[in-house]
Amino acid sequence: MARSKSSEKWLKEHFKDPFVQRAMKEGYRSRASYKLLEIQQKDHLIRPGMRVLDVGAAPGGWTQVAAPLIGRKGRLVAVDRLAMDPVADATVICGDVYDDAILAACQEALPGGADLIMSDMAPNMSGIASVDQARAIDLAELALDMAHRWLVPGGALLIKVFMGSGAEELRRALRRDFKKIVVRKPEASRARSTEQYWLALDFQGVAQERLDNGGASSL
């Protein structure tokens, strides 16, 4: 099937992108790695020995950055519906986080909860702005739901947020559960994109779905 002119234009722009070229040279799977590296440099959110859940992790750019920072004394779980190649010192789980079996697998890998949950999830774009924005906010809310399930008191949540309808409501929800929200726009984010990265710090809520002793609880 022949590519459309718009897809050809996107591919040309993509491969000319300096962060894409740098990722290829330095062995990262995605230009998104540099977004997390910049946030880490500014905020020092990932530390040795932490327990981290990377939601929507494929192809693994953020997982690659986080694994050596956490080290072998910590735990890093990367989950995505899409297949993902292994990353050293990380547990990769392939499946939908709405699936009970996948939730159980995450629980087994992180039995004591998570110190940090991070998500670089974005929807497959339809080209219809209102639809795409709603889907993007849904994914950010999914990451917040994961925080309610597994984040320990004092933990942090890092999410991608596309500014637009629903973003302010999401901000209010985060403020109910966290003491502070830091907003970042990394250099690797394309200037025309409305994406921001929100780092919510010092979780004040209670993880509702964590199975500390093998028994189930419900919302």
Swiss-Prot record:
UniProt cross-references to InterPro entries, sorted A to Z: RNA_methyltr_RlmE, RNA_MeTrfase_FtsJ_dom, rRNA-MeTfrase_E, SAM-dependent_MTases_sf
Origin: domain of life: Bacteria
Chief location of this protein within or outside the cell: cytoplasm
Alphabetic keyword roster: Cytoplasm, Methyltransferase, rRNA processing, S-adenosyl-L-methionine, Transferase
Subcellular location: Cytoplasm
Family of this protein: Belongs to the class I-like SAM-binding methyltransferase superfamily. RNA methyltransferase RlmE family.
Protein name, UniProt field: Ribosomal RNA large subunit methyltransferase E
Lineage per the UniProt record: Bacteria, Pseudomonadati, Pseudomonadota, Acidithiobacillia, Acidithiobacillales
